[in-house]
């Protein structure tokens, strides 16, 4: 959602429109009023006149306490930020001729990343003539994905990128 900058919010005398669709402090529709009439109504109840929908024809303004409105908006923004989850992509590098113990160590590290909620990019770099045996690398990647299938799903199947083959694993959604 876009945040409203302080200088972009039209309140009281900063309202540019001549006519406004007015909403009262309780949320009831008052109707289309001139800017002067709307300001007088807001001053009578000692509140502010705030444009809430500037793109509407005519713009929609509401009689409210602007300080309270701004505070509520900031509170909602903070709540939305809390709910956002930052997903990192961690990379595990393997070799097509990896030994079993090394494979298990790399697997343990990858599982740790996945349980934390991070995505995992498992890549194999082919050096020299090893590029002629891509199927060996593909088997290693498929074995890695198979070992992690209880906590992760394959987001991207094994794919070549230059001299590298990689697979993307994403943690399974918790229920």
From Swiss-Prot:
Please name the Pfam families in this protein's record: IF3_C, IF3_N
Tell where it localizes. Cytoplasm
| Gene Ontology biological process terms from the UniProt entry | ribosome disassembly
GO cellular component, alphabetical, reads: cytosol; membrane
Molecular function terms from GO = ribosome binding; translation initiation factor activity
Spans through the membrane: none
Xref: InterPro entries: T_IF-3_C_sf, T_IF-3_N_sf, Translation_initiation_fac3_CS, Translation_initiation_fac_3, Translation_initiation_fac_3_C, Translation_initiation_fac_3_N
* Keywords, alphabetical: Cytoplasm, Initiation factor, Protein biosynthesis
Q: Which residues form a coiled coil?
A: none
Q: Where does it mainly reside?
A: cytoplasm
Q: What does this protein do?
A: IF-3 binds to the 30S ribosomal subunit and shifts the equilibrium between 70S ribosomes and their 50S and 30S subunits in favor of the free subunits, thus enhancing the availability of 30S subunits on which protein synthesis initiation begins.
Q: Which HAMAP family match?
A: IF_3 (MF_00080)
What is stated as this protein's family in its record?
Belongs to the IF-3 family.
Complexes and interactors: Monomer.
| Protein's name according to its UniProt entry | Translation initiation factor IF-3
- List the source organism: Staphylococcus aureus (strain Newman)
What gene is it encoded by? infC
